[in-house]
């Protein structure tokens, strides 16, 4: 079984712990979907975290995904606890950078992005809270490309040719494979 260490990072209140709870619930690791606002999130174990509704200490949870064992690290998002978050970076295989669709890219989001690039951690961006009024998918994608990286692409479209071309353009080896096979590898 392959072991993967994956960190969840974001600015405060973007929904890191909520996303982590969802992953644990959908994988069958926890029986009840906890909520930060209900003070019953599985990963917010300290009373101070539950009282304030924020993550203060990085937490670990483990779940299985196919033949992979995922070690999930939920990190603090508040800038005051950045040192706690930064300590986790040296052990990550992958990261998920959570961005609130309602708030867009924040200053701390840019700092996290730069750190992830510095540590050369492959990163997925997860846009949360897109159901809130005033969110605009296209404006947010433009902001991601301008403030983070031009290579940000949407994976929600499925495996159509346009999406595969966008994915292929992010890496020369992937592009070579795409040009030869008209698809990309699943890994």
Predicted regions located by residue number:
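P-loop NTPase catalytic nucleotide-binding module
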Residues: 1-14, 33, 101-187
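P-loop NTPase switch module centered on the Walker A-proximal segment
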Residues: 1-99, 105, 143-152
